[in-house]
Amino acid sequence: MSVKASSIAAFALFALASAPVHAQALPKGDPVRGQTLFAQCKICHSLEAGKNGLGPSLKGITGKKAASSAGFKYSPAMTASGLTWKAAVLSEYLTAPMKKVPGTKMAFAGMSKPQDRADVIAYLAKN
């Protein structure tokens, strides 16, 4: 292998090794179990359109732009986040809300188990 070819190969290997690792696919969610898990979310959130509490209504949240529920005063960080609540983004956010959106008003440490997140997301998708 020539010096030029080995340099190109080394660069390609470095670029590949430096590429970001993408989040693993979510497990299949169980909306019935998700409803049970959602009990902890109901302390601050409702699933009734327009009924905000300490947190915004989560009615129809999947596929919506972040900070778009009418009548709720979002943090500047959430308003500027540019997020759309797809399943993968919801999972990242529910893992560690304050890490995903530094400055969010959501005072929740996060949900560490992928299956729990998938179940809650499946439940939200049905509401």
Give a label for each model feature.
Residues V21-F38:
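Electrostatic cytochrome c docking/interface patches
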Residues H45-K51, G63:
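Detector for the c-type heme attachment site
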